Structure formats: C-alpha cells, structure tokens
C-alpha cells in the first residue's frame, strides 16, 4: 500500500476516548475503555499544522465518548502546548456537561475554547434519553449548571429528536429559551424508526416555530429573549443561496462536500488512525470500515482515501424510500447538508438518506418557503435585513 501526506486539512476531531459517563439511548459509539495518549494527541495536532495554509486558523475539537474525562491527561496539556507554541488553532469541545464546573468553564473561556453542549430538553426528556449509568437522573446534575453554561459560552442547545418527542419540539424549544439559550438545534436520530404519526407531529411542531418566526421577524428588531432555530435558519440561507436553481428546476443532488469529509476535515481515534468522520472512528481501523483512511504517522492510504471520496462524489443523494425523490421539493437543495457517514452506517450507501431525515429536511423547507413568502416584502422587518433575496 502507498501513502500520501494530507494537504488540505482544516479541521480535526480528536476522539480522545470511547468511554462516557452517560448511557444515551441513541449513542452510535460502542463504549470501550479506550483512551488517547497525550503523545498521539500532540502528534495529531502536528499533522494538522502540516496542512496550515498560512492564513486561516485550523480547527481542533475534543470529542468522545465524553472528552472531559480526559481533562488532565489531554485537554489541559494540549491546550498549553498550542498556546506555548503560538499555533493558529481554534479549539472546541463537544460535551454533555456532566463534569463541567466553574474552574473548567473558566479555563475553557480563558483559552477561547468553543463549547458544543448536548442536552435533550427538560427533565423528562433528558432523563429518558440521556440517563446516568444505572438509570439515574442526568438532568438533576445539569440543571444547577445551566446558568453557568449560558453565561460562559452562550452555546447552542443541541438536542437529538427521538420519535416519542416529535410532538414536543415546541415545548423543548421554549424550555431552552426560558433557560437563556439563544440558539436551538434538533434533528432526528437516523437509527430510530419514526411512524407516519411521529413525522406528522414533527411537521406540525415546525409550523409552530414558523409562526414564531413570522411574529418576531416582521418586527424592526428581535426581542431580547428570542431564540434562533438553527435548522430553519440554515434552510432559509440555503433557500436564498440556491433559489435560482430551485425556481428553474435545476436539479443536482450530487454532494457539495459541505462537511469536508476526508478532505478538509477528519477524525483521529485513540490510537492515531484517521477516519473521514468522527461518527465512524469508533468502528475501528478495520478493512471493512469505509471511513478508515490512514494514520497520523503515514498519512492517507491512497487507495482507501480515493475509494471514500468516490462514494460521495460520484453518486446522487437519494432517499432510502423508493419513489420519494421525484416529487420532493427539497431535491434541489439535497446536496447542501447531507450526512454521508450516517447514511453509510445505516444503509451501507454514502448518499442514501434515512426517510425521517428526508421528511425533516422537506418539512423545514416548507416552513422556510411559508416564512419567506409572508415576510420577504416587509422591507422594514428584521427578516428583510437578514434574509432578503440578493437581486
């Protein structure tokens, strides 16, 4: 086999451990007592810097499992290494917050480490979806920390939407607002089964959020407690960016490579293997893992890297349910936000979307079109300033 050094990496996820202190019902990772050494973390960081283009900051994210378990062994010393050597790297961490305290929060903020915070809603949703080992309440641990988390980081309220909760999206959206969050994100768990009733509930809940947007975005300024629904705003931006394509019926479902899978972005597992995406790192550096593409010491395995790219560059994005694509209004935007790794893990094909994800995307576009139709002509509105079409 032959190898090549990566040239274009701009972001890297360090899967510093496969261990976790929660037992989430939908976790895609097989929890194992695997822990990255500091040496592997440092060597991965050096590889990322090999690809520095001399202009933009590189991005490095601590991921898991639960990365705060590696606070003393990796997060603190690697942050110090980056700081001591004045490396142009923007750090981030994805955490469930259970181990977060004031001292850690201050360290993260002082070192400009961004925080992605995973929480699924109020107590009944959080405790059902994301319990502690033994089924104990994780919400009771997190609730006293929420004010601190909002104050230090102003993070997105990032949740996973299970089927039973599809009729409660609005409830959790307002819960996040009342707790002081300014951004809310939710998406389906691609591994779960969603009934037609679940999906209809999801559409109805999105419509409620659409009305909330219309009521608030037609004003000349947003209220101080307004909470942005990130998926809808992403869809509105995509709608305006690709409106010409949409209105002309110019269909193109080939991937836009938005996530940088295996080219601009990659993931490193605990032993230094390189994967196209962090969601596939836990499956191990095995021959049958499509997303395993090399290691930090040798670089990309040329053939494996080429094979991965061919899977998502050469195939159109389609729905796993036959007959859905032809009449789908989202098909003109389908390449803009598709998750290849999830599709591969679930269907065995990189460009075959789970049906619930298709309904999710389509429902958001329907709401976006409704919001746009009502508000675009209101030239004094916040909406017109933020989302108006470019002529």
Predicted regions: what they are:
Residues 69-184:
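Conserved AdoMet/S-adenosylmethionine-binding subsite of the radical SAM
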Residues 29-34, 128-136, 345:
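Short glycine-enriched, charge-decorated loop/helix-capping segments at active-site entrances
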Residues 258-263:
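Short, small/polar residue-rich loop motifs at catalytic or cofactor-binding pockets
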Residues 205-246, 279-329:
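C-terminal accessory region of radical SAM enzymes
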Residues 1-106, 110-111:
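Conserved alpha-helical substructure of the radical SAM core
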